[in-house]
Amino acid sequence: MELAVGNLSEGNASWPEPPAPEPGPLFGIGVENFVTLVVFGLIFALGVLGNSLVITVLARSKPGKPRSTTNLFILNLSIADLAYLLFCIPFQATVYALPTWVLGAFICKFIHYFFTVSMLVSIFTLAAMSVDRYVAIVHSRRSSSLRVSRNALLGVGCIWALSIAMASPVAYHQGLFHPRASNQTFCWEQWPDPRHKKAYVVCTFVFGYLLPLLLICFCYAKVLNHLHKKLKNMSKKSEASKKKTAQTVLVVVVVFGISWLPHHIIHLWAEFGVFPLTPASFLFRITAHCLAYSNSSVNPIIYAFLSENFRKAYKQVFKCHIRKDSHLSDTKESKSRIDTPPSTNCTHV
């Protein structure tokens, strides 16, 4: 369930195209569309690089050593975000670059369906991570028996199954639309009964945004309250660490809310009100698009690169590659080194 941006907008009726923006066209697509494509490109490049690095670091676990539950959730989040960036953004960018849909019915269904699946997987994973941290800090005595890889993998499986099921109406109702007065083709949601779409939009907002956000806030509020009570018995180093955790938590909640709130506002507005078609609303929809897409790029920064341990492991990845490349070069120069194994003194997460 994604935002439509052509002369067809959210809803079940064909709306007239909004007034054209004042600036002239750039490369034949308009200044606003060109800027949007540039932003998409930056989000794509940053997100693919960041999520690929996260996956690489987390995949380098020591043999026989189980991954932590936190790392498993971060890995799942990065895989979902990377898949979304690779499979959705390049195709969705054609909406801004071309006046009509040219990618066929399957791609039309797939990218909008996977957009919703990825959105739900990300949100549910963030909620699962908040519960995981709550158990680890507030119920530390019982956490060792609950926070095990098997339970985390089971949670990941449930997250994907639930997301795939919740997004299925999008795959069913998304399709090609051919206006009678035009030879153009659009990729658009078509619901026979408007009441069903209203119900689905509300359910997606409640179960795919509001409740997970409330759960995240509840868990982190409990965590911060627990840490505040324990601060008196902590060393300065430990106190600084807990404050860092509190700052990260604040960033997590704020970014989560900001990234997806405009997306849901537009869908609710379109279904239960009259969404205006003006240059201002057009820019608002573009902003909502970019914010939703950027969430897949900022997650690696929030959950990985703010961690000192992760940064150290990230540096070790490059050190290991440098050592291995150096060893391969040495073996070519000296036959006496052919049987010498490469250095494996690398840190794993």
From Swiss-Prot:
Q: Where do we find S-palmitoyl cysteine lipid attachment?
A: C320
Gene3D superfamilies, alphabetically?
Answer: Rhodopsin 7-helix transmembrane proteins
Mention one GO molecular function: galanin receptor activity
**Which cysteine-cysteine pairs are annotated as disulfide bonds in the entry?**
C108-C187
Side of membrane Cytoplasmic, spans? 58-70, 132-151, 222-248, 293-349
Compartment(s) of residence: Cell membrane
**PANTHER family named in the record:** GALANIN RECEPTOR 1 (PTHR45695:SF25), LEUCOKININ RECEPTOR-RELATED (PTHR45695)
Pfam families found in the cross-reference section:
7tm_1
Main location, first listed in the record: membrane
Which residue spans traverse the membrane?
37-57, 71-91, 110-131, 152-172, 201-221, 249-269, 272-292
Disulfide bond recorded as keyword: yes
Which residues does the entry place in the Extracellular compartment? 1-36, 92-109, 173-200, 270-271
Positions of glycan attachment = N7, N12, N183
PROSITE patterns annotated for this entry?
G_PROTEIN_RECEP_F1_1 (PS00237), G_PROTEIN_RECEP_F1_2 (PS50262)
Q: How does it assemble?
A: Interacts with GRP39 AND HTR1A.
Its name, as the record gives it, is Galanin receptor type 1
Function statement = Receptor for the hormone galanin. The activity of this receptor is mediated by G proteins that inhibit adenylate cyclase activity.
Q: Give membrane topology per the record.
A: Multi-pass membrane protein
InterPro entries reported for this sequence: GAL1_rcpt, Galanin_rcpt, GPCR_Rhodpsn, GPCR_Rhodpsn_7TM
Q: Which family does it belong to?
A: Belongs to the G-protein coupled receptor 1 family.
